[in-house]
A protein has these predicted regions:
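Inter-heme linker and motif-flanking segments adjacent to c-type heme-binding CXXCH motifs
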Residues: 596
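Short, conserved catalytic or interaction motifs in soluble domains
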Residues: 600
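Structured alpha-helical subdomains that flank or immediately precede key functional sites
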Residues: 1-563, 570-572, 578-582, 586-593, ...
């Protein structure tokens, strides 16, 4: 779809209702209150299908409402805060770490966790939460039946036995992705973005900029959400505890950054929270360590006053030595946080990689790389404090958690940025063969989103998002964040045809030897009516083409010959006269040469990825969506198109363009037609 832009300081968009029956949270609650029943969600039933998709539950779970687990259930006790979040049996610590960070952003929290719900007179067993998904805010409704074992919650829960907002939040997020199991394994950044609509950045601590502490401090001051983790070298190391009390492969949230005076020197400290709340750092600056006795009392009282169980301080240099990754989620202009000193300009567009047409793979696959979706980015104004343009480009694949139950997981994705020539549409293979990228994602990786920050001179750029390997399908969203307004345009989006009027056929006494031979064959087949039917045309063309050894094919089908007659039969007799056939044969010879230019191995087939070039050479320009449909219609399982299907495709397209052009008398690109006209046109293609 076309690229969209988000203006600075735009109002927060309204969340879309997601229930299959179209009802909103308020409508469901009101209906249940009137009928005096508790809501049971038909879209996410309280059974094993909501828990696991790949196996049977390891335990006998019972689904119970909060009122069955305690005497005085509350949605939120006091204020929602990071101590309300305790990990359960599910491996979704990444979600817990993001939720802990969310509690520090009260206005964002109020959006994700609306406070218009409680266990009071308005209680009807229904709750709702709001998440950002692929450039839209969604309102997700759930009932309050939660999985338990022996009357205890087994998934995410609060430290307070009668508080349930965090458990219900996890259930709503599981519903969004199809099941609780779909939440196993992930990046803190993924949930941070879903809670804010923000854009993520990732830093490797061992190779981070020297000003990483300043970058993180400014990010926290701007209400950004942050997380960190320690890499693992094998699955056996996952959740393994180090001697210093840190857990590998575990998602932590970053909740504070401070500088303190210690024995006359400035020490940079970072506060980190473990969602488990039990295992903590035991090195320097840990709880009760000797370093705190050497800090100014005012600093110590101020810093330690708000630390909780599972939350610890460490020196920033120790942090960089022990942790491997830092994730920062920057907030977008429509965030609910006010008075932040920096706002982004945002452009975005959606697309997909489809086998046989737009799933070209990375630059390693040069023959198909150019077929990937392309879009042009124009940067005109430099940053206020520099002569370059700062941009963050984020490529996100869509709905992959939801598709896990169908055997699909994250694709390995990345992107490249090229300097774009002026006034050029979709760029072809030779451009990428001879021109290197100006910027690119650091690596291809199988995560939901890959993002990079660049500083580029003003100019025109081409962004090419890809999967690592060709023929891999996925839907994607690209967001471009720039300090100054940028313009973006999808390449290859034009649909047009340059089809000159067919030449006048030569008179009989001016016919070439080839035409005289075709006339003799035509006369043998046509009989007294001097015209041939589709079946006679099939016989004639198969006979003529079989003598051309360079064209390898199994014969034209009757369907193809009907399409040829529909294109060339100007007097609507359902047959071809020889003068009409001569005009067609001139077209046919050009189409044959075009096909052979792509059938380099003379197999009788061409790659469906090259259909865009072939059709453009024949005078027809299609966008990616139409090329995807043609690939699905005419290509085989190896993404090849044989000669008969190629001919059918090109004949039908030319016929459709010519019919449209005859109806578009004002050359406006639009036609109005009634059902009769539409059916007549469809039948004649």
């Amino acid at each position: 779809m076309p690229i969209q832009s988000s203006k600075q300081h735009s109002a927060a968009p309204v969340a879309m209702d997601t229930q299959n029956d179209g009802r909103s949270f308020k409508e469901i609650r009101q209906d249940c209150l009137q009928r005096q029943v508790l809501f049971e969600d038909p879209d996410f039933p309280a059974d094993d299908s909501a828990l696991f998709y790949s196996k049977s539950p390891p335990l006998a779970f019972e689904w119970k409402r909060p009122g069955e687990l305690c005497d005085n259930p509350r949605f939120v006790v006091g204020d929602a805060n990071r101590t309300d979040i305790c990990q359960g049996q599910l491996g979704d610590c990444w979600l817990l770490a993001a939720t802990a960070s969310l509690t520090l952003q009260k206005k964002n929290l109020a959006r994700v966790v609306p406070r218009d719900q409680e266990f009071d007179n308005s209680y009807a067993g229904v709750f709702h939460f709001q998440f950002w998904q692929h450039n839209k805010w969604l309102d997700v409704v759930v009932d309050d039946r939660l999985p338990t074992v022996r009357n205890k919650l087994v998934m995410l829960h609060s430290a307070s036995n009668n508080e349930f907002w965090s458990a219900l939040l996890e259930k709503a997020y599981a519903k969004l992705h199809g099941s609780y199991e779909s939440l196993k394994g992930g990046s803190t950044m993924e949930a941070m973005e879903d809670f804010t609509g923000g854009v993520g950045e990732m830093y490797e601590t061992k190779s981070a900029p020297k000003k990483l502490f300043t970058i993180m401090k400014k990010a926290l001051d701007r209400s950004s959400m942050m997380g960190c983790s320690i890499d693992i070298s094998s699955s056996a190391e996952s959740e393994a505890q180090t001697s210093s009390g840190l857990v590998k492969g575990h998602a932590y949230s970053i909740t504070g950054l401070e500088e303190v005076n210690c024995r006359g020197r400035k020490v940079q400290l970072i506060r980190i929270r473990n969602p488990w709340g039990t295992v903590e750092w035991n090195g320097p600056w840990s709880d009760s360590s000797k370093e705190w006795s050497q800090v100014d009392k005012a600093d110590k009282d101020r810093i330690l006053k708000h630390s909780d169980d599972g939350e610890f301080w460490m020196e920033f240099e120790d942090f960089k030595s022990n942790y491997d990754k830092v994730e920062i989620c920057n907030l977008t202009p429509d965030s609910l946080v006010e008075n932040t000193p920096h706002h982004w300009e945002v452009s975005w567009f959606e697309g997909n990689w489809i086998r046989g047409s737009t799933a070209g793979g990375c630059r390693n696959y040069i023959d198909t790389f150019w077929t990937n979706p392309q879009f042009k980015l124009t940067l005109e104004d430099t940053d206020d404090d520099d002569d370059v343009c700062s941009v963050v480009i984020a490529l996100m694949q869509k709905n992959r958690r939801l598709l896990r139950k169908e055997g699909m997981d994250m694709e390995t994705i990345g992107f490249a940025v090229y300097e774009a020539p002026d006034d050029v549409d979709q760029l072809g293979k030779d451009f990428f063969r001879y021109n290197g990228s100006k910027a690119r994602s650091r690596t291809y990786v199988n995560v939901r989103e890959v993002s990079e920050r660049f500083t580029l001179p003003p100019g025109n750029y081409l962004v090419v998002p890809t999967t690592f390997q060709p023929h891999h399908e996925a839907d994607f969203l690209i967001r471009v964040f720039s300090e100054k307004k940028a313009t973006a345009l999808e390449m290859g989006s034009e649909v047009d045809a340059d089809l000159p009027d067919p030449p006048m056929p030569s008179s009989p006494d001016e016919e070439t030897e080839e035409e005289k031979g075709l006339r003799r064959l035509f006369d043998q087949l046509s009989g007294s009516d001097q015209a041939i039917s589709a079946r006679e045309l099939q016989q004639m063309l198969n006979g003529v083409l079989s003598r051309r050894k360079e064209v390898k094919f199994d014969g034209l089908t009757l369907n193809t010959c009907h399409s040829i007659i529909n294109l060339m039969d100007v007097d609507n007799t359902g047959q071809l006269e020889f003068q009409e056939f001569k005009v067609f044969w001139e077209k046919m010879k050009k189409w044959i040469m075009l096909f052979l230019s792509f059938d380099t191995d003379r197999s009788g087939k061409m790659s469906s990825y090259e259909l865009r070039i072939a059709l453009k050479a024949a005078g027809m320009q299609l966008n990616s969506k139409l090329l995807q449909l043609l690939g699905l219609r005419f290509a085989d399982e190896n993404f090849d198109i044989d000669f008969d299907d190629y001919l059918t495709c090109i004949v039908r397209l030319e016929n459709m363009f010519r019919v449209f052009q005859s109806l578009d008398t004002k050359k406006s690109g639009r036609v109005n037609m009634n059902i009769m006209q539409f059916l007549m046109m469809s039948m004649n293609v």
